[in-house]
């Protein structure tokens, strides 16, 4: 590492970055520089594009700047298989339930957010929409459609919603098409998302 002035970032011949503190020493560990948090390993090398376990919590450092993610999603994977993790107010990775921008969301044990999928949590089934928000008081789905009550718990069987009657087939949900459904020995005509199209049933 070439010698530079204190209080600035320097780059070595391998392209790695370090920071010279005001006392002239290389920064190591977590550092606050210009109101941003950064991490430097014991040799002074700056962490970039890395998820690190520090004091029992996970943190992520930006690929370009090295700044710690705070209140920010980290996106991985390609267009068809994107995965999302989230780092909160203190920069640590969020697991389990959280409220982000007013939306109730959930992160699995591996830290990835449940999106556009059904997931069982604490004995209850939930559905999380494409943006990751929990379905509540509404009908939505991906290949199958579900109704969730105000607490997000999925309900099956006959459901009344917005002055319409729906049948949500247990356990897999309603279809997104017009179809005949046998229910307790009677056949009903159902529309997309399980909406009852006529009140007459045929034996």
Model-derived regions, located:
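Extracellular adhesion/carbohydrate-binding repeat motifs centered on closely spaced tryptophans
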Residues: 1-203
């Amino acid at each position: 590492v070439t010698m530079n002035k204190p209080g600035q970032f320097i780059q070595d011949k391998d392209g790695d970055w370090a920071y010279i503190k005001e006392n002239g020493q290389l920064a190591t560990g977590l550092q606050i520089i210009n109101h941003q948090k950064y991490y430097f390993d014991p040799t002074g090398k700056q962490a970039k594009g890395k998820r690190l376990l520090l004091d029992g919590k996970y943190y992520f450092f930006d690929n370009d700047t090295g700044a710690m993610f705070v209140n920010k999603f980290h996106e991985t994977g390609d267009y068809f298989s994107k995965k999302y993790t989230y780092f909160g107010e203190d920069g640590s990775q969020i697991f389990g339930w959280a409220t982000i921008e007013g939306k109730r969301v959930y992160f699995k044990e591996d830290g990835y957010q449940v999106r556009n999928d059904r997931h069982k949590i604490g004995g209850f089934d939930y559905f999380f929409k494409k943006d990751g928000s929990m379905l509540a008081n509404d009908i939505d789905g991906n290949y199958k459609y579900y109704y969730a009550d105000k607490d997000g718990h999925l309900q099956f069987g006959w459901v009344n919603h917005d002055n319409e009657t729906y049948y949500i087939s247990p356990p897999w949900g309603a279809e997104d098409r017009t179809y005949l459904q046998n229910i307790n020995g009677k056949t009903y005509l159902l529309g997309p998302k399980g909406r009852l199209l006529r009140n007459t049933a045929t034996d």
